[in-house]
């Protein structure tokens, strides 16, 4: 007879009990298999005693044996007496989620599967491809280089073609063998021709000395049209090609086009002035416009060359040095007098006209011919002709009119020259100064005293050199404008 067992202990059965257990197992095999459930073992220490099959009954954990809900070993075939429970039998079939990420701290004692084949997720590790994967063998992704797309495609096509060939050979036998033989011979002959032609690559036009390089022809759908009526798409493509031909090649216009005669764009005619292929062969307006622009540019270049030619040997009449041969490149400038054609460098003539040892009538006159000049115009080139000098003076005045007068100071100060000042008199809001009306009796009262007062004011400013910038220091002398009042 079976003895009643206390909870948490193992039941020992007799022969009749074993027969009853076998009958129960047979009934369970015939009945539908239920969904397996996991029953937590009893938390009591030493949950069972050793069974007849060698189980040590250390119990309490899932690795102590196969227990049912009452804590008794079912004595099934799964129990081998080594302490492996049915809970471990199904957990070992589940991959450990922490092992997938390489962070399982249980190691070999983990109840779940640590199979490498289950861990791989089928995705190649991008850090392994870069050579910087910190997980190493513990990484859950594959550490292998994937096949290239071309190789994979070729492998797939080869497999499909081999399968198709095997199936066709099994079904098609007879007259097709002779036909396939003829086709194979023709393919072999064509392949031999291609190989023979490829051996002659050393004689290509690219390697022949003295021959112009012509790039490969750009593939076009209209080069080999299908026989038959021309479709609408083909006509549109031909029209587009014609319109493209009307455009000049930008690479040929500035140098050399690598496509040469095979370029889809139009290569223009050579211009005699600039030496570039920029003249459209069919656009007369474009040709005339470009030629006119080249002529204007050529005239400017010639004027520049002539100006340098007549300026390079000019000697200053004060320091007796060639202006273009001075040690300081900033001193390669001329001080051109408005009413005189004598040559002076800008530094010397400014020093002469700012001297205080002589009267203003003497210092404002030419050191050689004593002709009084109202202006000293800085210039990088020597100008002697009257018309050219007038143009230079006009440009000089226009340049000065764009600079604000430091004496007017946007309305906060007072400029002694008034409307005769070359500099700009403008308020902060953008308004220009309106000329002031002279009061009756003020213009004729002792004008000499007023002139002397202004002269002393500007001579003091000239000596203090208020212009800090070198460019502004050589542009204009305010003291010279007294002669215009």
Swiss-Prot record:
Zinc finger region(s), C3H1-type: 90-117, 124-146, 243-270, 399-428
Molecular-function GO term, any one: ubiquitin protein ligase activity
Entries under SUPFAM superfamilies matching the protein: CCCH zinc finger (SSF90229), RING/U-box (SSF57850)
GO biological process, any: protein polyubiquitination
Stretches for region Makorin-type Cys-His: 271-298
Keywords: Metal-binding, Repeat, Transferase, Ubl conjugation pathway, Zinc, Zinc-finger
Pfam families: MKRN1_C, zf-C3HC4, zf-CCCH, zf-CCCH_2, zf-CCCH_4
InterPro entries, sorted: MKRN-like, MKRN1_C, Znf-CCCH_4, Znf_C3HC4_RING-type, Znf_CCCH, Znf_CCCH_sf, Znf_RING, Znf_RING/FYVE/PHD
Chain ranges of zinc fingers (RING-type): 316-370
Residue spans of biased composition, Gly residues class: 45-63
Residue ranges that the Swiss-Prot or TrEMBL entry lists as coiled coil: none
Catalytic activity field: S-ubiquitinyl-[E2 ubiquitin-conjugating enzyme]-L-cysteine + [acceptor protein]-L-lysine = [E2 ubiquitin-conjugating enzyme]-L-cysteine + N(6)-ubiquitinyl-[acceptor protein]-L-lysine
Enzyme Commission number, as recorded: 2.3.2.27
Described purpose of this protein according to its UniProt entry: May act as a E3 ubiquitin ligase catalyzing the covalent attachment of ubiquitin moieties onto substrate proteins.
Protein name, as recorded: Putative E3 ubiquitin-protein ligase makorin-4
Classification lineage: Eukaryota, Metazoa, Chordata, Craniata, Vertebrata
Recorded name of the encoding gene: MKRN4P
């Amino acid at each position: 007879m079976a003895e009643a067992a206390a909870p948490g202990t193992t039941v020992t059965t007799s022969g009749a009990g074993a027969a009853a257990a076998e009958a129960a197992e047979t009934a369970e095999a015939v009945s539908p298999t239920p969904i397996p459930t996991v029953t937590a073992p009893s938390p009591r220490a030493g949950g069972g005693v050793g069974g007849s099959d060698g189980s040590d009954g250390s119990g309490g954990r899932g690795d102590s044996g196969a227990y049912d809900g009452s804590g008794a070993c079912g004595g099934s075939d799964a129990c081998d007496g080594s302490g492996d429970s049915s809970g471990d039998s199904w957990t070992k079939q589940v991959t450990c989620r922490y092992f997938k990420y390489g962070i399982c701290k249980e190691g070999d004692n983990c109840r779940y599967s640590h199979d490498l084949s289950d861990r791989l997720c089928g995705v190649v590790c991008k850090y392994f491809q870069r050579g910087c994967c910190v997980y190493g063998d513990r990484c859950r992704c594959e550490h292998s280089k994937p096949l290239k797309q071309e190789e994979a495609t070729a492998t797939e096509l080869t497999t499909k073609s081999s399968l198709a060939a095997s199936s066709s050979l099994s079904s098609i036998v007879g007259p097709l063998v002779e036909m396939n033989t003829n086709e194979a011979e023709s393919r072999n002959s064509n392949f031999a021709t291609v190989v023979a032609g490829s051996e002659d690559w050393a004689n290509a036009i690219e390697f022949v000395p003295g021959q112009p390089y012509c790039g490969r022809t750009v593939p076009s759908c209209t080069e080999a049209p299908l026989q038959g009526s021309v479709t609408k798409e083909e006509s549109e493509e031909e029209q587009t090609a014609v319109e493209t031909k009307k455009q000049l090649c930008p690479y040929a216009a500035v140098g050399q086009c690598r496509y040469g005669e095979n370029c889809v764009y139009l290569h223009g005619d050579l211009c005699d002035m600039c030496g570039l292929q920029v003249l459209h062969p069919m656009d007369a307006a474009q040709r005339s416009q470009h030629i006119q622009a080249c002529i204007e540019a050529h005239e400017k270049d010639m004027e520049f060359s002539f100006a340098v030619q007549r300026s390079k040997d000019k000697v200053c009449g004060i320091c007796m040095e060639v202006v273009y041969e001075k040690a300081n490149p900033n001193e390669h400038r001329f001080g051109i007098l408005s009413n005189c054609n004598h040559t002076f460098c800008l530094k010397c003539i400014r020093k002469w006209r700012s001297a205080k040892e002589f009267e203003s009538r003497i210092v404002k006159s030419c050191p050689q011919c004593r002709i009084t000049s109202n202006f000293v115009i800085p210039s990088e080139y020597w100008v002697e002709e009257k018309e050219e000098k007038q143009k230079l003076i006009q440009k000089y005045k226009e340049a000065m009119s764009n600079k604000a007068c430091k004496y007017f100071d946007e309305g906060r100060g007072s400029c002694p020259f008034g409307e005769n000042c070359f500099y700009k008199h403008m308020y902060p809001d953008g308004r220009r100064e309106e000329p002031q009306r002279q009061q009756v009796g003020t213009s004729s009262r002792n004008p000499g005293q007023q002139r002397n007062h202004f002269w002393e004011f500007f001579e003091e400013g000239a000596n203090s050199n208020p212009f800090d910038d070198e460019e502004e220091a050589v542009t204009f002398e305010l003291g010279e404008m007294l002669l215009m009042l």
